[in-house]
Amino acid sequence: MDFKVFGKEGAPSLLLIPGLGVSYEIFLPLIGLLEARFRILAVQVDGFTLGTFTRFTSIDDQAAQVIAYVKERQGGRLDCAYGLSLGGKILSRVLERNEVVIDHAILDAAPLLPLPRWLEGPLRYYQCANVWTCYHWTGFWRRVFHSHYFDVLLDECRKVYPFGGGRAVLDGYKSVFPVGIQIKVVNIFSFFNNSL
């Protein structure tokens, strides 16, 4: 994992975590608008770093690296953090571990659905079956995604797929916030307007 830093020292901090298959460059237009007023930390997720080879191992590993960086470089505190898609899932794990203080967290299109318990198993099997069939029947996903990342994804699918004996991992829909984080919906624009 790599971090790109923009903006001035001492300004309110803003962490940006991109989604699957993209680098921090997806945020460059936003960074251009906000770097005069914020200290922006843009994450390059393992497996999608530009210019260096890295391997994506797990969402928990990515969250641990974000936490370590925030503790070391930001004193364990952020004013705002934004996670897009997979970045939102990583950010949810950072929040779940409760090791750093984040005043405002925005999880955009993160795979966090409030589902009834009885629906967790069937949905997990359904998702794994989709990935499994796409991989084995067309090979499409292996061409789209970094091959090592896809191998990790398939390993997770094998744990819950019927042939894997149903060894489900605690991920995705099963228990997103085991430490009881309360989510408060706020107007995110008020944060940016007050800070601008």
Regions flagged by a language model, labelled:
Residues G83-L91:
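Gly/Ala-rich beta-loop-alpha elbow adjacent to hydrolase catalytic centers
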Residues K4-T52:
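Conserved HGGG/HGGXW glycine-rich cap/lid loop of the alpha/beta-hydrolase fold
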Residues E96, I102-W132:
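Flexible "cap/lid" loop of the alpha/beta hydrolase fold
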Residues P29, R93-R97:
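Active-site signature of alpha/beta-hydrolase-fold catalytic machinery across serine-
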Residues L41-Y82:
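Active-site loop/oxyanion-hole signature of alpha/beta-hydrolase fold enzymes
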Residues R117, T133-V185:
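Conserved alpha/beta-hydrolase catalytic His-Asp/Glu region
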Residues V185-F189, N193-L196:
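Short beta-strand/loop motif that positions the catalytic acidic residue
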Residues S13, R39, L78-C80, I102-H104:
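Structural signature of beta-strand start/N-cap positions in the alpha/beta core
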